[in-house]
Amino acid sequence: MTKQLPYGRATLSVSFPEDLNVEWVQPDYGPGAPDPSALLAECLRNPIGSRPLADQARGAKRVAIVIDDITRPTPSRLMLPAVIRELHAAGVAAEGIRIVVGVGSHRTMTPAEIAEIVGEDIFPRYTVVNHQARDPQHLADIGRSPRGIPASVNRTIVESDLAVLTGFIKPHNVAGYSGGYKAYFPAVSGIDTIVGLHDLQKLPGEPCRLGEIDNPFRAEVDAMGPLVPVPTFLLNVVINRHKQIVRAFAGDPRQAHQAAVAETVKRATVPVSQPADVVLAGGGGYPSDISLYQGINALTSVVRLRKPLVKEDGQVILLGEFREGLGSEFGSGGRHKDLATAWASHLKKMRRLTVVSPNVPHEPLAAAGIARAQSAEEAIRRCAADYRNPHILVMPDAPYTVGLTG
């Protein structure tokens, strides 16, 4: 049996031995909207829990729009024009619009990358800036979270009359689901805020899990959102594996996000017969598999669940292009010292992790006790040989999947 798995900007052909017990686990997000521009306009003009965007923007001189960075497949090329049209209809001039790229602690984006995600029509006409999480001059302190985490946000936001948060919804290994006020925290917040929030995943009992929205991280983010002293409007979308917009939700950041998550839960959740001996977790293609750091989203779709999809004595194969290697988040200047430290809690939940990618160096993998294979077929053959009649799960779009065992 041969299947095509998302890999970088293309697909990778992977052959599975016919004698193996293979279970295919893939969500169905549905077809893309026939007219996404009309869909976006409709939800911006008929939002959930708030006035239409144009009404809120009327009289505003400065508006900040927060967008996702290159590591997310958010269709900003479609979303930005829809938002900007409403702002112009309200009388906001192009000079008054600032687009802030929510890179969080990731590397900043190049001009070419910015043009790619916002579109050639937007980039030269509107100001687009990378967030700077480590530069105090670019940050404004706005208080503390309920747990005492210092809250800071990009200064462009607080100097605006209105902020528009954009993003897409997917299962998230710490927040439960992405989107909502997460576009503020951690996307455009200071490094102390980012570290404080991510430390919540280390709380005893691992209360922050994939696909569970009721958790300390999300509660903290949602409590911090109203600290931002600017009226905030949200636009979140649900996309399918082809990066097409399926549904769109706009309005009050809490209410619109809750509606978007409820829709995503129905589409992302897939029943799984039982925990497997071997799980092949695909990185989901570009940009989800841009680096091994982003590959954590595929790995946690297997292990960071109330009921992990791999047995305690099982193995996980992580497949992705990982064109940027480990990612800028590791090593000097990064948020993590090394791979072994960053992934320690995940690695202890399985016998072995094997990475399949030509772009990840051997040394940091070996130092973390992670195996490496030249091909998916080699990894499958090697892992399956350790079991008698192994049960194998294949998750082509692991970062977008919530597998539920009985």
Walk through the language-model features, giving the residues of each.
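N-terminal amphipathic/basic leader segments beginning at the initiator methionine
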Residues: 1-44
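Short glycine-rich or small-residue beta-strand-to-loop segments that form or flank ligand, phosphate
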Residues: 62-73, 98-104, 280-282
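Histidine-anchored nucleotide/phosphate-binding helix
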Residues: 73-92, 298-310
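Short internal beta-strands
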Residues: 94-105, 315-321, 351-358
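A glycine-rich helix N-cap at a beta->alpha junction
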Residues: 114-139, 340-341, 345-348, 358-359
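Conserved, well-structured core segments that form the ligand-binding/active-site neighborhood
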Residues: 124-275
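A glycine- and small/hydrophobic-rich beta-loop-beta segment
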Residues: 247-349
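Internal helix-turn-beta structural module
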Residues: 341-401, 405
